[in-house]
């Protein structure tokens, strides 16, 4: 409590010392244009030390960034390519390349579609895209079920001749799956051969 009550008393004292209005000082009075920033900082630090307040951290202005020595670079980011970072744009970034064993499995060239599905945007036509594609979840599920993930390690029949237009026609002409409207388990049918995780299974040959 005493520390905070002393702060309002200390500030006018600092101002009097800065502007040379203290009568006990024998120096010539200082005008605001003769007071340097270093003088103010020195006085403030002295008052703060007397009051027991921690010294503020030292911050370096941006123009001192040129004084840093040694190679400086920043690695990472969102793969935007070459950038120049820092206050003056003098710190080049390192573009991280995905090579060798560092490449995740999903990034490898052999883990993709040789001819990816490409439905046309609504109301648009163009070469290479499927026109009049049904915008339904069921069609999307069936389309994806019929796709063969291209993988040279496995021998998919006809993978090299995979064609999205033929696939579209095949799905379009396929018989629609019949929806089951009645759930037999809601009608009383029991699940056979299902064991709960924490229960002990009972086998017919065991004695009660």
Swiss-Prot record:
Disulfide bridge map: 120-129
Single annotated GO MF: enzyme inhibitor activity
Superkingdom of this protein's organism: Eukaryota
Signal sequence, renumbered to the chain: 1-26
InterPro entries from the UniProt entry: Secretogranin_V
Main localization (coarse): secreted
One cellular-component annotation, GO: secretory granule
Compartments where located: Secreted
Pfam families (alphabetical): Secretogranin_V
GO biological process, one term: intracellular protein transport
Record keywords: Chaperone, Cleavage on pair of basic residues, Disulfide bond, Neuropeptide, Phosphoprotein, Secreted, Signal, Sulfation, Transport
Positions of modified residues (Phosphoserine): 204
PTM summary: Proteolytically cleaved in the Golgi by a furin-like convertase to generate bioactive peptides.
Function text: Acts as a molecular chaperone for pcsk2, preventing its premature activation in the regulated secretory pathway. Binds to inactive pcsk2 in the endoplasmic reticulum and facilitates its transport from there to later compartments of the secretory pathway where it is proteolytically matured and activated. Also required for cleavage of pcsk2 but does not appear to be involved in its folding.
Similarity field: Belongs to the 7B2 family.
Subunit comment: Interacts with pcsk2 early in the secretory pathway. Dissociation occurs at later stages.
Name of the protein in its database record: Neuroendocrine protein 7B2
Protein source organism: Xenopus laevis (African clawed frog)
């Amino acid at each position: 409590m005493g520390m905070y009550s002393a702060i309002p008393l200390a500030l006018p004292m600092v101002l009097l010392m800065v502007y040379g209005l203290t009568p006990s000082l024998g120096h010539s009075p200082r005008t605001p244009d003769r007071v340097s920033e270093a003088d103010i900082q020195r006085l403030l630090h002295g008052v703060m030390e007397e009051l027991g307040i921690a010294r503020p951290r030292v911050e370096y202005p941006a123009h001192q960034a040129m004084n840093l020595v040694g190679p400086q670079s920043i690695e990472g980011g969102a793969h935007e390519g070459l950038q120049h970072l820092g206050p003056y744009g003098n710190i080049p970034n390192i573009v991280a390349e995905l090579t060798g064993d560092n490449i995740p499995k999903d990034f490898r060239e052999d883990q993709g579609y040789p001819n990816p599905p490409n439905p046309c945007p609504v109301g648009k036509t163009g070469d290479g895209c499927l026109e009049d594609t049904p915008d339904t979840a069921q069609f999307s599920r069936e389309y994806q079920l019929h796709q063969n993930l291209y993988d040279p390690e496995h021998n998919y029949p006809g993978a090299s001749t995979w064609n999205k237009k033929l696939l579209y026609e095949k799905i379009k002409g396929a018989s629609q799956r019949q929806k089951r409207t009645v759930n037999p388990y809601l009608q009383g049918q029991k699940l056979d051969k299902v064991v709960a995780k924490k229960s002990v299974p009972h086998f017919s040959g065991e004695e009660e």
